[in-house]
Amino acid sequence: MGRKWNNIKDKKASKDANTSRIYAKFGREIYVAAKQGEPDPESNQALRVVLERAKTYNVPRTIIDRAVEKAKGGSEENYDELRYEGFGPNGAMVIVDTLTNNVNRTAADVRAAFSKNSGNMGVNGSVAYMFDATAVIGLEGKTSDEVLEILMEADVDARDILEEEDAVIVYAEPEQFHAVQSALKDAGVEEFTVAELTMLAQNDVTLPEDAQAQFEKMVDALEDLEDVQQVYHNVDLGE
């Protein structure tokens, strides 16, 4: 699959360690999920996914509780979920997911991040067809064969199960996210190193060194935007 998921997560966490930016993004996502449905993860699958993701980034309980309480309190703050698609250096493909309370601001900010870094925004559907929505679950302490056996016994399907350094990474359909986690929890897995719903590129590309440096700068500029929640792409950064 070309991605080392633990390394990607650690890199993101390290980048945001001093600014708590990642906590702010999770706070917004938790608030939106709790506001759109019940503020109880047992009856709100979207909220449960966000909370499972937040665990893998060690988001403080105070951040989570504050966001849920804000939703419970009937806050009138509303966010739109918008997706932008575009191209980076050498035609690299990028998807940007946002939560915004000001569409014009967000569109302008995203467009600027692309254009200032040798990229350009595309129209809806211009790159998304080259990505697959995927649940990615990572764990340690099991082999891929053991994980396969656990999932088979629980009658849970997975697209692929790979070993990555000390971890096992399960790739599954998005709707299987909770089923995969539940089967593994029932088998004694207490902690997940990765828990993501992502857009996975069907084919990764490798860029020349100068183009990759420009591309990473563009991704950083996009991820630094307050309204941007996730940036997906098809570039193998060698993580």
Curated annotation (Swiss-Prot):
The record, for SUPFAM superfamilies, names:
YebC-like
User: What is one GO biological process annotated to this record?
Assistant: regulation of DNA-templated transcription
Q: What is its main location?
A: cytoplasm
Query: Source organism's superkingdom?
Result: Bacteria
For whether the record's keyword set contains Transcription, the answer is: yes
GO cellular component, alphabetical, reads: cytosol
A molecular function annotated in GO for this UniProt entry is:
DNA binding
List locations, semicolon-separated: Cytoplasm
The alphabetized UniProt keywords are:
Cytoplasm, DNA-binding, Transcription, Transcription regulation
Entry-linked PANTHER family: TRANSLATIONAL ACTIVATOR OF CYTOCHROME C OXIDASE 1
Q: Which family does it belong to?
A: Belongs to the TACO1 family. YeeN subfamily.
Provide the protein name.
Answer: Probable transcriptional regulatory protein BT9727_0453
Species: Bacillus thuringiensis subsp. konkukian (strain 97-27)
